[in-house]
Amino acid sequence: MVAGCGAMGIIVPVYCRAHLYCIPLFSMTGILLIISISLLSIYCVLLIYYCVGWAVVPNYAMLNPQHTVSITIIIPARNEEKNLPALLDSIDHQTYSKEFFQVLVIDDHSTDNTANIASQYPFVTCLSLKDFIGSDSLNSYKKKAIETGIKNSVGELIVTTDADCIVPAKWLATIAAFYHQYKPEFMVMPVAINCTAKPIEIFQALDFMSLQGITAASVHKKLHSMCNGANLAYTRKAFEAVDGFTGIDTIASGDDMLLMHKIAQQYPAGIHYLKSKNVIVQTAPVHSIAAFLNQRIRWASKADKYDDKRIMAVLFLVYFLNVMLLLIPVLSLVSGQWSVVLYWLLLLAVKTIVELIFLFPVATFFHKRPLLWAFPLAQPFHILYTVIAGWLGKFGSYNWKGRNVK
């Protein structure tokens, strides 16, 4: 390899298949390549750190089941008549004694049969959110639903899940045993997407699984805040000590991560990750590209509200790396610098390989290794959606359960 100077600046020729390609390093594409290589290098180091973090999270084995911890399960529900029965049936089959847990379904202004379905289960108390709030429009009905549930609960430990989820039989028993043993204030637990063979569902399952692996590693290593409201547990004491959702109640989403950060600030040693197959909550995928983008835009909308600067740094790194990887092939084709595409493919290959190294043990834990064949094929689409969802999460709006939110 030889470097020289040309009219456009430094030229780096690359020999490939008997052709000599020259890329002006100080051209737009050359600068983007340098930035992308730098960002990708940092990203790979971070993923290796996550990989080590995942490996050292202990697999929790429930040796002595505890049936004395008082638990309240809070389920916010809006128009969930199709999904709610499966969740409540799975809760009905818990090995944990019903004497020690309470189930509250908070009906968030449903226009379907959600409330009637919930009321058919004798162990469920259904509360109507409209009985507890005024007629004023809110920006976060879900936080208000959870807050209402907590105010009407009796449990020492609050457990939250979503109405479109299914929980395993030993879910509560394992949570109670872990809580009894370690006395955490906030417990983060695994969630998996229950997908079919449809490409959009496989894509979601892979994307979500990567987030779950990062969640476990970051929580255990105390690198930054990350969790999912479909499977959380926290003490009533901690929720009340941080004054609940006060200060974040005007933000549309964030009933999970924003609350986690508030509790972590007051109880830095009280945040634990419960890694056990007994507590993997299965959640339903969305069934269209439009619904998927809408969901991810909703998730991205809270990004600039995080007080945790560490997660902000990670999000910026990932977002701008994907922006660079999207711009490089576009600019190379526009400018006619076809050789840059070879570098782009190399960057994609490195990114994909490092991500697969990280994902393999995570997929093993979630019993989703057969899905990994699709991961390289999904890479370009993942880059595109990350850029779109990140931008619209900041500057656009989204629809949630028939409500338009900005």
Description of each model-found segment:
Residues 69-72, 102, 258:
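Cell-envelope/extracellular polymer assembly enzymes that use nucleotide-activated donors
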Residues 89-100:
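Short, acidic, metal-binding catalytic loop of nucleotide-sugar glycosyltransferases
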Residues 113, 163-178:
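Acidic donor-binding/catalytic loop of UDP-sugar-dependent glycosyltransferases
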Residues 158:
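Short aromatic/hydrophobic "clamp" motif used to bind/position activated sugar donors
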Residues 179-212, 237-240, 246-311:
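Catalytic donor/gating beta->alpha subdomain of glycosyltransferases that bind UDP-sugars
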Residues 24-66, 202, 359:
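N-terminal membrane-anchoring/stem segments of glycan-assembly enzymes
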Residues 65, 311-396:
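Membrane-embedded multi-pass helical conduit in multi-pass membrane proteins
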Residues 107-115, 131-133, 165:
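A conserved acidic beta->alpha catalytic loop
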